[in-house]
UniProtKB/Swiss-Prot annotation:
Reaction(s) catalysed by this chain's protein: [[Fe-S] cluster scaffold protein carrying a second [4Fe-4S](2+) cluster] + N(6)-octanoyl-L-lysyl-[protein] + 2 oxidized [2Fe-2S]-[ferredoxin] + 2 S-adenosyl-L-methionine + 4 H(+) = [[Fe-S] cluster scaffold protein] + N(6)-[(R)-dihydrolipoyl]-L-lysyl-[protein] + 4 Fe(3+) + 2 hydrogen sulfide + 2 5'-deoxyadenosine + 2 L-methionine + 2 reduced [2Fe-2S]-[ferredoxin]
Protein name: Lipoyl synthase
EC class (word): transferase
Protein species of origin: Alcanivorax borkumensis (strain ATCC 700651 / DSM 11573 / NCIMB 13689 / SK2)
PROSITE patterns: RADICAL_SAM (PS51918)
Keyword annotations from UniProtKB, A to Z: 4Fe-4S, Cytoplasm, Iron, Iron-sulfur, Metal-binding, S-adenosyl-L-methionine, Transferase
Family: Belongs to the radical SAM superfamily. Lipoyl synthase family.
Name of the gene encoding the protein in the UniProt record: lipA
Residue stretches making up the Radical SAM core domain: 80-297
Binding residues annotated for [4Fe-4S] cluster 1, in chain numbering: C68, C73, C79, S308
Cross-referenced PANTHER family: LIPOYL SYNTHASE, LIPOYL SYNTHASE, MITOCHONDRIAL
Amino acid sequence: MSEQAQAKRKVQIGDKLRGADKVRTIPMVNEETGYQRKPDWIRVRVPANGEIQRIKSLLRKQKLHTVCEEAACPNLPECFGGGTATFMIMGDICTRRCAFCDVGFGRPNALDAQEPLHLAESVENLGLNYVVITSVDRDDLADGGAEHFAECIRQVRALTPETRIEILTPDFRPCLDTAVEILAETAPDVFNHNIETVPELYKHIRPGARYQHSLDLLKRYKALRPDVSTKSGIMVGLGETFEQVINTIKDLRTHDVDMITIGQYLQPSKHHAPVDRFVHPDEFREYARVANELGFTSVASGPMVRSSYHADLQHKGVDVGLYKP
């Protein structure tokens, strides 16, 4: 099948597009790029893979997915090697085509009603004290999947009530009010939604989302559940300026976000948005200094920091980036 014919072919339920097929319609300057050489401060530790294979085997048995695998997270060896994982619910097919993300795009399958129970059983079997639950975007669902999130929270609390739960949600367009009310009623310990990048880059990097909508989601949730910590994350190295990042940090704080993560964007494939630059550790320290001065309760800022990286320590206020107050 020719490339033109592939582009015109209707995506069927269950189809998952990745790489060039996924990002073909995104208005990017470069549709295909090479990779920049990584600087010395970008390092990924690779431990023995016995624990990694054990966790993967358990997840496949329970028909579960992790964002660690689907999004090609560079910290997968460290997190899996330490016996932790971020679970990705509602399948592995996303209804959005973000230029930075390696999760597949397409028409998702129906929700698995047994997934919340399987997730809770895996949390119990892995002995997790802290679990992060995230998802693909599900624009095909009336509530964006909020009730499925809530059922996952209920099932985990039923089996392991001592486990702390963080949810990393999509933006719930266009069902913000419904989703927020559902998740305010069945609340996690941390409500996380990533702003991802500065507003000036949304058209090219996050074309299916709206910057102000994401800010409104975070503020609305905090208004309904002031007892629950709110959290958001920013990627840098996509072409933004220092001043734009500072403004985004300030926007998050003025929208009542408590915790923030700032990390280096790494290109998942040659078809994704290219790395504009590798941000020096000193710049991450400056972002952290500003964030601390603005009053965030937890700041994680460093090249390898990701939203879910050592999320348990972030929740406790432990520094997992570069900045030392």
